[in-house]
């Protein structure tokens, strides 16, 4: 999820949705789904997001509840899904899996205690959330029935989204992860799953504010710590930038301090030259099949109609109002 300390360095300004009309947002699909599953949909009634067979379907509620915000402001989302993971990312995934298993044990223990309050259980449930194959595949299918554009990344969806934005094929990246800055995303919208307006991280303004190159920003982040490495002891955002200014780059900093960060060059490459593709194509003129979408959510997966009907109505109304339905 990236190092939250990057926020200290990021140039961030509020971005009202009303100013986003006509834009295309390349959304990190896994990040967007995870936020909905852990912060939004989890607080609906429990039977609404789990089938009788125990399959989680909260993602379907999240898609239906989350899309109207885009369409009501004439914003086209393009959902970018993760592909494979690097060896270093696989190590991080394994660490998160181990941590999640510990939280799952705590959750089971909490449920067995009569005095455990609902807030504690909700917090533990959010920490044990995982994106299962079923969640990812049913999300793809629902987006397809709603004719919402999808791009398949060869590796990290966020890296692919940043690449698309740098090529001019998207106006913004949509992600809660501060690593979007390190991937060179020109403009990143955070808070797309919240009730209010999002905020926008500006890549070039961030570099200018701290007198850093893209490489320098990545080097500073590695010194602070990333998903792929522990940072140097006592090195926070201000110190990291100062060290890069004093020594020029990551290698020189490490040499001057007689220190080491394992796989530092590979980590740099993951941010500066990630696996991405130009082999994608999508149409922003959408043509939703609402009947098939409703059928998929409420009949195929058994989501209570009252949980999603207003969302479907808002999508349908907004598609008409914003002129996205070229077929009318």
Swiss-Prot record:
Give residues annotated as binding Mg(2+) 2: 177, 179, 227
- Residue ranges of the region described as I-domain: 120-248
Q: Please name the source species.
A: Natronomonas pharaonis (strain ATCC 35678 / DSM 2160 / CIP 103997 / JCM 8858 / NBRC 14720 / NCIMB 2260 / Gabara)
Q: Tell me the domain of life.
A: Archaea
Name the record gives this protein: Flap endonuclease 1
Any Pfam family matching the protein: XPG_N
The UniProt family comment states: Belongs to the XPG/RAD2 endonuclease family. FEN1 subfamily.
GO MF, any single term: DNA binding
Note how many cofactor molecules are bound and how: Binds 2 magnesium ions per subunit. They probably participate in the reaction catalyzed by the enzyme. May bind an additional third magnesium ion after substrate binding.
Describe the protein's quaternary organization and the partners it interacts with: Interacts with PCNA. PCNA stimulates the nuclease activity without altering cleavage specificity.
Q: Name the UniProt key words of this record, in alphabetical order.
A: DNA damage, DNA repair, DNA replication, Endonuclease, Exonuclease, Hydrolase, Magnesium, Metal-binding, Nuclease
State its cofactor.
Answer: Mg(2+)
Kindly indicate where the leader peptide sits in this chain. none
Function noted in UniProt: Structure-specific nuclease with 5'-flap endonuclease and 5'-3' exonuclease activities involved in DNA replication and repair. During DNA replication, cleaves the 5'-overhanging flap structure that is generated by displacement synthesis when DNA polymerase encounters the 5'-end of a downstream Okazaki fragment. Binds the unpaired 3'-DNA end and kinks the DNA to facilitate 5' cleavage specificity. Cleaves one nucleotide into the double-stranded DNA from the junction in flap DNA, leaving a nick for ligation. Also involved in the base excision repair (BER) pathway.
What are the BP-aspect GO terms? DNA repair; DNA replication, removal of RNA primer
The cross-references to InterPro entries, in alphabetical order and at most eight, read: 5-3_exonuclease_C_sf, Flap_endonuc, Flap_endonuc_arc, HhH2, PIN-like_dom_sf, XPG-I_dom, XPG/Rad2, XPG_CS
